[in-house]
From Swiss-Prot:
Identification of the protein by name: Melianol synthase CYP71BQ17
Topological category with respect to the lipid bilayer: Single-pass membrane protein
Biochemical pathway: Secondary metabolite biosynthesis; terpenoid biosynthesis
Catalysed reactions, as listed in the record: dihydroniloticin + 2 reduced [NADPH--hemoprotein reductase] + 2 O2 = melianol + 2 oxidized [NADPH--hemoprotein reductase] + 3 H2O + 2 H(+)
Organism ancestry: Eukaryota, Viridiplantae, Streptophyta, Embryophyta, Tracheophyta
Pfam families to which the protein is assigned, alphabetical: p450 (PF00067)
C-alpha cells in the first residue's frame, strides 16, 4: 500500500535533489570518463610526447631549424620512444639502439613496410623500385635480384676498373687545378655519378648535368614532410601547393632519360642476338633485362619496373657515396690531427707508387675508422623510415597499426650515453672495436638494418674508400682565402639525405705527383 504525503507537508522537509542541469553535467562527465578509459585501454600504453595542437599536431615544434635536429631535441626530453602527431600522421621516433633492434630485427616482419610518400609514389613508378616497393612478393623478388645479381660482391668487384678510372680522373683534375679554389662537393658528386652511370648504363649519361639536377630535386622533396604526406586525406591540397606539377615535370624529364637508356640497351641486345654476338661485359640494365627475359614465365618485369630499379640504384648509390665523402673531407679539414694521421697512413702504405689501386685499400685501417666515424656523425639519411603493419609493443609502449616509425640515426650518432664526447670527430673510438656498419650493431646503422637493409653497402663503401684514399695520398688541403679551419661551416641541409648546406670549397696542393 502506497503512503501519501499529507497536503500540508512542508516542502522544506523533502530531501534535496540535484537540479536537472547539474545531473546532466554529472552524467556527461561520467560518460566522458568511461569513453576516455575505454580509449586508453584500447590504445594500450602510448609513447610519451608533447601535447599536439588541433590540425597542426606537433608540426610547430619542428619549424625552428632542421626537422631532424628538432626531433632529436624532443627525443632527449621525452626518451628513446617518442610519439608525435604531424598533421594527420601518427609518428613514432626511435632513438636508442636497443629499441631500434626491436623494430628492425625482433619485429622486422611487422616493420618491413616503408611509409608512403607522395613524391616517391610518382618518382618510383608507383612504388616499383627496390627501396620503396611495398613488402610482399614483388619486393622479395626484386630484393633477390639486387642481392644475387645487381649488387653482389662479385658484381661490385667487377666494377673495380670503373671506380679506378673515375677516381683517377678526379685526381687528374685536382692536379691541374694549380692551387685554385675548387668546389670539391661538385667534383665528388660528378665522380660518383660517373661511376654509377658506367656501372648501370655501360657509359656516362649523355644528359649527365640534367640527370644530376633532377636527382637533387628528388632528394629535396622526397623526405616525406610535404603537405601531401602530412595530410594524406586532403587530396584537394595537392594542386594548390604546386607539388604535383613540380613532381610531374621532374618525372617526365627523368622518364625520358631512362626510356632512352633502356631503349638503347634493347636495340643493342637485339642487334647482338641477330649477329650471334655474346656480350663480354654487362652493365646493370643488361642484367635486369636478362633476368626479365630468363624469368618471363615466372616473374613479369615491366619496362617501368626496369626504369624504377635503374633510378633506384643510381640515386641511392650516387647520393650515399658522394654525401659520405663530402662529409669525411669536411671533418678531416676541421680536424687537422686526424687529417695528418690518415695521410701518413696511406702515404706510408703506398710509398713509391704514382697512384693507388683498390687492392691497396686493405692496408688502410685508420682510413676505415675515419669512414666509420663519418657514418656515426653524418649518416647519409638522418632517419630510417618504417611503418607498422599491425599493432605491437615496442620499448614497453604500444605502437598502433599503420604508424609511421622513424629510426633517428642523427640522435643515436650523437647520444652521450652511447658515445664519449659524441660531438667530437675521433676515429680512434672504433680502434679495437667490433662495431661495424653492416646492420649488426644498432648504434651504427647508416644503411639501415633488418630485411630492408640497403643492398648497396659494398658498392658504396668501395667508392668511398678509394676516393678518400686517393685524395689523401696525392694532396694536401686547405681552405681558400686564408680562412681558418675553425671557420668551416658544417651546417646541414634536410632531405632524403643530409648533405652539406654549403658546397665544400678547398685548395688542393699536390704532395705526390699522379701518373695515370
Amino acid at each position: 500500500m502506497r503512503t501519501k504525503l499529507p497536503m500540508d507537508f512542508p516542502i522544506s522537509k523533502m530531501p534535496h535533489l540535484p537540479s536537472l542541469p547539474v545531473s546532466l553535467s554529472f552524467l556527461l562527465f561520467f560518460l566522458m570518463l568511461v569513453r576516455y578509459w575505454k580509449n586508453s585501454k584500447g590504445q594500450g600504453k602510448p609513447p610519451p610526447g608533447p601535447r599536439p595542437l588541433p590540425i597542426l599536431g606537433n608540426l610547430h615544434q619542428l619549424a625552428d631549424g632542421l626537422p631532424h635536429h628538432a626531433v632529436t631535441k624532443l627525443c632527449r626530453k621525452y626518451g628513446p620512444v617518442l610519439k608525435l602527431k604531424l598533421g594527420q600522421l601518427d609518428v613514432v621516433v626511435i632513438s636508442s639502439p636497443e629499441v631500434a633492434k626491436e623494430v628492425l630485427k625482433t619485429n622486422e616482419i611487422n616493420f618491413a613496410q616503408r611509409p608512403e610518400v607522395y613524391a616517391v609514389e610518382i618518382m618510383s613508378y608507383d612504388h616499383s623500385s627496390i627501396v620503396f616497393s611495398p613488402y610482399g612478393d614483388y619486393w622479395r623478388e626484386m630484393r633477390k635480384i639486387s642481392v644475387l645479381e645487381l649488387l653482389s660482391n662479385r658484381r661490385v668487384l667487377s666494377f673495380r676498373s670503373i671506380r679506378e678510372d673515375e677516381v683517377w680522373n678526379l685526381v687528374e683534375f685536382l692536379s691541374s687545378s694549380d692551387e685554385r679554389t675548387i668546389n670539391l662537393s661538385e667534383k665528388i658528386f660528378s665522380m660518383t655519378n660517373d661511376i654509377i652511370s658506367r656501372a648501370a648504363f655501360g657509359r656516362k649519361c649523355n644528359d649527365q648535368h640534367n640527370f644530376t639536377v633532377l636527382l637533387e630535386e628528388i632528394m629535396k622533396i622526397g623526405a616525406g614532410f610535404a603537405i601531401a604526406d602530412l595530410y594524406p586525406s586532403l587530396t584537394f591540397l595537392r594542386p594548390l601547393t604546386g607539388v604535383k606539377p613540380a613532381l610531374m615535370r621532374i618525372q617526365n624529364k627523368m622518364d625520358k632519360i631512362l626510356e632512352d637508356i633502356v631503349t638503347e640497351h634493347r636495340i643493342k641486345r637485339k642487334a647482338a642476338a641477330n649477329s650471334n654476338i655474346k656480350f663480354e661485359e654487362e652493365d646493370l640494365v643488361d642484367t635486369l633485362l636478362n633476368y626479365a627475359e630468363a624469368n618471363k614465365d615466372e616473374f613479369h618485369l615491366t619496362l617501368d619496373q626496369v626504369k624504377a630499379v635503374t633510378l633506384d640504384i643510381f640515386s641511392a648509390g650516387s647520393e650515399t657515396s658522394a654525401t659520405s665523402m663530402e662529409w669525411a673531407m669536411s671533418e678531416l679539414l676541421k680536424n687537422p690531427r686526424v687529417m695528418k694521421k690518415a695521410q701518413e697512413e696511406v702515404r706510408q702504405a703506398c710509398k713509391g707508387k704514382s697512384k693507388i689501386r683498390e687492392a691497396d685499400i686493405q692496408k688502410l685501417d685508420y682510413l676505415k675508422l675515419v669512414i666509420k666515424e663519418t657514418f656515426r656523425l653524418h649518416a647519409p639519411g638522418p632517419f630510417t623510415p618504417r611503418e607498422s603493419r599491425e599493432r605491437c609493443e615496442i620499448g614497453g609502449y604500444t605502437i598502433p597499426a599503420k604508424a609511421k616509425v622513424l629510426i633517428n640515426l642523427h640522435a643515436m650518432g650523437r647520444d652521450p650515453t652511447i658515445w664519449t664526447d659524441p660531438d667530437c670527430f675521433q676515429p680512434e673510438r672504433f680502434q679495437g672495436s667490433s662495431v661495424d656498419f653492416k646492420g649488426n650493431h644498432f648504434e651504427l646503422i647508416p644503411f639501415g638494418g633488418g630485411r630492408r637493409i640497403c643492398p648497396g653497402i659494398s658498392f658504396a663503401t668501395a667508392n668511398i674508400e678509394l676516393g678518400l684514399a686517393q685524395m689523401l695520398y696525392h694532396f694536401d688541403w686547405k681552405l681558400p682565402n686564408g680562412k681558418k679551419l675553425e671557420d668551416l661551416d658544417m651546417s646541414e641541409n634536410f632531405g632524403m639525405t643530409a648533405r652539406r648546406k654549403e658546397n665544400l670549397q678547398v685548395i688542393a696542393t699536390t704532395h705526390i705527383p699522379f701518373q695515370k
